[in-house]
């Protein structure tokens, strides 16, 4: 099998340190399945992981993947060889930048039948992230009627997470306010289903007042938590809930949350697979719901760019594009 990896952490300005490696196909054990990978999607987390300590070289990155089950471990009950599946993997295992990958069945689901592999692979990591935010953290109802009248502000609505989060929120009955700044990102947010799109290059509090937008029940921050921290506190309702996927880089005053009794949560979709939590199967269930909603026409894929061929050059270029922080939707590599 072929893998694209690296020996040591590196920044892009050091040059392209991705290399091709070959090894024998692994044999699945326990609840693992062996997947022949067809397509992968590259995420911002890949660029962060590339710069972290390498404990076992070569380090093979990659999270989103779609492919065909080739073999199963003795404890596998959900899949059979030949099934086409998609998943987001785990950072404590070798990733999907490879022609074959081992992954636990608990974080895998059968892929949608009505869209292409390059489209479907845009959904697992961002979709699970959004599902965990809405259903585990915000605890919205699975009955859309029970969520009517509630609203969410999604900061950076045109990114990979924001794109699918908007669709999920609309599917389950929330009013969705997102942010963007360019014409093309604003139009993308509207295409994803946003009710209101605000300009995040301008004062959001002022825009809320000018447009007479009520304070929101939930805020989902997918970009620069430090920059928006105080703004989010102003725009959330009393007893509201803020969730971010972006770590703080500066010290922030947690006491500022007290006056409104705001709940603040970090979302990290890899927490379940890294720690093999007892409820890890939820990621399988969330992916199943994504497949159901894609096949019923409620969701659309978020792929906007496709590279042909798994190579060090394509992977390096993908990381370059993501580090510019101007991507709309998702970038895919067709293996």
From Swiss-Prot:
Superkingdom of the organism of origin: Bacteria
Protein keywords: Metal-binding, Oxidoreductase, Zinc
SUPFAM superfamilies per UniProt: GroES-like, NAD(P)-binding Rossmann-fold domains
Signal peptide: none
InterPro entries the record matches: ADH-like_C, ADH-like_N, ADH_Zn_typ-1, GroES-like_sf, NAD(P)-bd_dom_sf, PKS_ER, Quin_OxRdtase/zeta-crystal_CS, YIM1/Zinc_Alcohol_DH_Fams
Family recorded in the similarity comment: Belongs to the zinc-containing alcohol dehydrogenase family. Quinone oxidoreductase subfamily.
Organism of derivation: Staphylococcus aureus (strain MSSA476)
UniProt-recorded Gene Ontology molecular function terms: oxidoreductase activity; zinc ion binding
SMART domains: PKS_ER
A Pfam match: ADH_zinc_N
Protein name (database record): Zinc-type alcohol dehydrogenase-like protein SAS2087
């Amino acid at each position: 099998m072929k893998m694209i990896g690296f020996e040591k952490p590196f920044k892009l300005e050091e040059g392209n340190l991705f290399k091709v490696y070959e090894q024998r196909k692994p044999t699945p054990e326990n609840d693992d399945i062996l997947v022949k990978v067809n397509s992968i999607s590259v995420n911002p987390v890949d660029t962060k992981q590339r710069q972290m300590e390498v404990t076992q070289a070569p380090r093979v990155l990659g999270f989103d993947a779609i492919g065909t089950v080739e073999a199963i471990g003795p404890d596998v009950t959900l899949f059979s060889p030949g099934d086409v599946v998609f998943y987001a993997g785990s950072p404590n295992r070798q990733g999907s930048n490879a022609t074959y990958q081992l992954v636990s069945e608990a974080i895998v689901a059968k892929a949608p039948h009505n869209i292409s592999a390059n489209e479907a692979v845009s959904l697992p990591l961002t979709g699970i992230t959004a599902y965990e935010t809405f259903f585990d953290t915000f605890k919205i109802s699975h009955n859309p009627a029970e969520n009517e009248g509630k609203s969410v502000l999604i900061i950076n609505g045109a990114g990979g997470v924001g794109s699918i989060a908007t669709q999920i929120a609309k599917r389950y009955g929330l009013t969705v306010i997102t942010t963007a700044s360019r014409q093309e990102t604003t139009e993308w947010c509207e295409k994803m289903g946003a009710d209101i799109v605000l300009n995040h290059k301008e004062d959001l509090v002022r825009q809320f007042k000018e447009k007479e937008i009520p304070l929101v029940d939930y805020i989902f921050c997918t970009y620069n938590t430090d920059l928006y921290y105080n703004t989010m506190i102003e725009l959330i309702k009393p007893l509201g809930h803020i969730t971010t996927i972006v770590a703080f880089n500066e010290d922030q005053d947690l006491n500022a949350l007290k006056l409104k009794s705001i709940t603040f949560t970090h979302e990290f979709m890899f927490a379940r697979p890294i720690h093999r939590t007892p409820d890890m199967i939820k990621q399988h269930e969330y992916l199943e719901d994504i497949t159901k909603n894609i096949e019923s026409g409620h969701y659309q894929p978020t792929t906007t760019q496709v590279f042909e061929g798994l190579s060090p050059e394509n992977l390096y270029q993908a990381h370059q594009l993501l580090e510019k922080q101007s991507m709309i939707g998702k970038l895919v590599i067709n293996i």
